[in-house]
């Protein structure tokens, strides 16, 4: 679970679906 990334990505990908894209990048 990429919980560690939830600290930065939600700012740009708070939707979750887009967050997945940010996690890949």
UniProtKB/Swiss-Prot annotation:
Chief subcellular location: secreted
Entry-annotated residues carrying Methionine amide: 25
Annotated keywords: Amidation, Cytoplasmic vesicle, Secreted
Compartments, as annotated in UniProt: Secreted; Cytoplasmic vesicle, Secretory vesicle lumen
Biological process terms in GO annotation: neuropeptide signaling pathway; positive regulation of peptide hormone secretion; positive regulation of phospholipase C-activating G protein-coupled receptor signaling pathway
UniProt xrefs under InterPro entries: Bombesin (IPR000874)
One Gene Ontology term, aspect cellular component: secretory granule lumen
Disulphide bridges, residue numbers: none
Coiled-coil ranges from the UniProt annotation: none
Role according to the record: Stimulates the release of gastrin and other gastrointestinal hormones.
Annotated TM spans: none
Family the entry assigns: Belongs to the bombesin/neuromedin-B/ranatensin family.
A Pfam family: Bombesin
The protein, known as: Gastrin-releasing peptide
